């Protein structure tokens, strides 16, 4: 199967998922959020993979969520309807985004991630959901949501404070 955001190879029990949008710094477009859980869940059901390795093509691991996630049928939700309907659509969308990374935690095999360059915003959410993280010397990390007035609500903080001291997690956020 082919994917817009990923290249998938499977060899000798190793499933290698590579982010494949280097021209856009591997930003997470709307299809990313459906493709990732599809790939991971299929591999989790398939007995031929013993481990999943995530990596990225290009200079940066990922620049995080693409702005189109907010506009193209994304967080905008329905334009009409009551405030309750819009709020419920927003909540449903956020839960779907969270589920895209929860599948990494729930996979039957370990998920490892190799990081180079930038790992910003949503990329931080993703790497905190993996079992092991390996970073190149040029890797840098940023929870960028707070800089633009957003809450990092795709799972960053609950996962991050399990990995590093809470003070460091707070410092990364500002």
Task: Map each language-model feature to its residues.
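A short, glycine- and basic residue-enriched loop/turn
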Residues: 22-25, 59, 68, 138-140, ...
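Histidine-centered beta-alpha loop that forms part of the nucleotide-sugar donor binding/catalytic region
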Residues: 20, 65, 116
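Glycine- (often His-adjacent) and acidic-residue-rich active-site loop
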Residues: 56-99, 149
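Charged catalytic carboxylate motif
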Residues: 31, 35, 96, 103
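Crotonase-fold acyl-CoA enzyme core
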Residues: 102-174
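Conserved CoA-thioester-binding segment of acyl-CoA-metabolizing enzymes
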Residues: 1-57
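Hydrophobic/aromatic residues within transmembrane alpha-helices
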Residues: 17, 54, 66, 126-128
